């Protein structure tokens, strides 16, 4: 198995040849400021490395908005609505699966998106909990932003 040193060595080789590495960096399940979130913000800031923070709209406290708004390298995104597993027993976890009423899903998506509008740099990206959602919502997501 590769180690962090292996990754660092590889990135150094890339740099030596003029290549840039592009990567996706995201933190999930944000609802309030925590020591770990603070550390993530610090690393992001020190390295000028933008980071997406997936915020659970229905659970997020006002202090999270204040803290993330003060962190210029942080980009909040909508992470579900309540982050509750609604999947039937025996199925993979999902909050936005096709087993739920479409109108309820659309209302939760819209309400969640609207509740996050006070975040600066809000990314127009939906991060479904457990990285699963019904494909039927793709068009609706585009329609709300």
List each language-model region with its residue ranges.
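Active-site beta->alpha N-cap acidic-glycine motif
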Residues: 2-75, 115-118, 127
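Short amphipathic alpha-helical segments
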Residues: 38, 138-139
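Metal-dependent polysaccharide deacetylase catalytic core of the NodB/CE4 family, i.e.
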Residues: 50-136
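His/Asp/Glu-enriched short active-site or ligand-binding loop at hydrolase and phosphoryl-transfer sites
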Residues: 141-145
